[in-house]
Amino acid sequence: MHAGWRGVDNLISVKAVRSMAYADETLLGAKAASTYNVYIGPHIGPECFETGADVHARFVSQFGEACAFDGSHIDLAEGIRIQLDQAGVSRSRICDLAKCTVCENSEFFSYRGQGGTCGRHGAFAVRTR
């Protein structure tokens, strides 16, 4: 799934985990979310993701200072980790590529980093038993 700042703000990670866990309960039981491995792919990093006061305040209110620090920058990956933890996914099962799409624009596309004109990324996930 894709979770830009609006998706993170709207708890898309929690909703996705709960939806999958509901579907997996018959197979994995009530603790299904604790068995999930999560990969956080390339994204705008906190050093490059500067926001206005309104968005910053929303993130502080939602997730605390851990992901909305210094008054203007937001750490989207930390917001996602907080959400996943709340949904029952163990932090030890979350892998963050930690590649900033703005800083590494020769490797990745970035809407913000490229002034609104950019390409697209693709990813897929496979469940194995």
Q: Locations of the language-model features?
A:
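Active-site microenvironment for binding and transforming phosphate-containing groups
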Residues: 1-129
